């Protein structure tokens, strides 16, 4: 089982699109694949599960979800009843693995553990109770059930992102060719290296995924060359901009199912092949 985190502390760089489309290609190639959505915006969840995973003031988040899992990790009884009831609740929650929170997507071999908009509210209590390794332990129990796991993370270095990095083998870093993304990259890589040193020496930076790359424009080419000159692991397969991505989001269909021969789909295919060879 191979577990990848798609992570960037900067928002708007295509984390969810990259997560879902690589996962969809993985599943399309016959690999049993799971997407875990740790971003309260739930873009990956909605991309794959459509209206079922949308939420609003009048519509709660789809359950069970990743927030429910972390609530169960905390072991808080649902009621303030007798001690026996409390202990029974704790034992029941302890026995429940991550597979109890999985939803099947409409696509063969592709499952999802959806996010919840209120997930962030649990971060402080999870930190205070030292639950940072629980996701890693839960994923180890899934070994044999999935070939590939992709984790979408929030645009912040917080409890949930750190949990994902501790649980993963590899991290993919989406990158837009602008000065703000480049400035944020050093801090991001420092955080990953610190996680390697302190928590997870198995974790590898699989590469920087250049998204929205305009090959005809001078600035993107210069920025990418600067990254390479600095010795950063820029992946050769880059993702061009295309309006078809918006159509893919709107129809809740990953590119491999919506337009398999499109140039952006083919770019994703090349990217998947490149990272799988590592």
Walk through the language-model features, giving the residues of each.
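P-loop NTP-binding core
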Residues: 1-278
């Amino acid at each position: 089982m191979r577990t990848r985190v798609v992570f960037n502390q900067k928002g708007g760089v295509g984390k969810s699109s990259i997560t879902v489309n690589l996962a969809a290609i993985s599943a399309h190639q016959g690999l049993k694949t799971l997407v875990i959505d740790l971003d309260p915006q739930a873009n990956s969840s909605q991309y794959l599960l459509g209206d079922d995973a949308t939420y609003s003031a009048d519509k709660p988040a789809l359950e069970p979800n990743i927030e429910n899992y972390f609530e169960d990790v905390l072991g808080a009884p649902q009621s303030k009843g007798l001690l026996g009831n409390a202990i029974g609740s704790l034992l029941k929650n302890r026995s429940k693995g991550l597979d109890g929170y999985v939803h099947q997507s409409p696509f063969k071999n592709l499952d999802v553990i959806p996010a919840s908009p209120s997930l962030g509210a649990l971060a402080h209590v999870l930190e205070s109770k030292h639950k940072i390794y629980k996701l890693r332990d839960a994923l180890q129990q899934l070994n044999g059930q999935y070939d590939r796991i992709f984790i979408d993370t929030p645009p912040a270095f917080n409890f949930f992102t750190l949990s994902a990095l501790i649980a993963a083998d590899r991290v993919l870093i989406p990158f837009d060719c602008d000065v703000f993304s480049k400035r944020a990259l050093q801090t991001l890589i420092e955080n990953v290296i610190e996680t390697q040193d302190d928590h997870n020496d198995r974790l590898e930076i699989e590469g920087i995924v250049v998204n929205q790359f305009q090959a005809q424009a001078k600035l993107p080419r210069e920025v990418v060359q600067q990254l390479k000159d600095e010795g950063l692991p820029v992946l050769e397969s880059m993702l061009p901009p295309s309006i078809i991505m918006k159509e893919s989001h709107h129809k809740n269909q990953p590119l491999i199912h919506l337009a398999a021969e499109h140039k952006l789909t083919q770019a994703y295919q090349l990217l998947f092949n490149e990272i799988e060879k590592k």
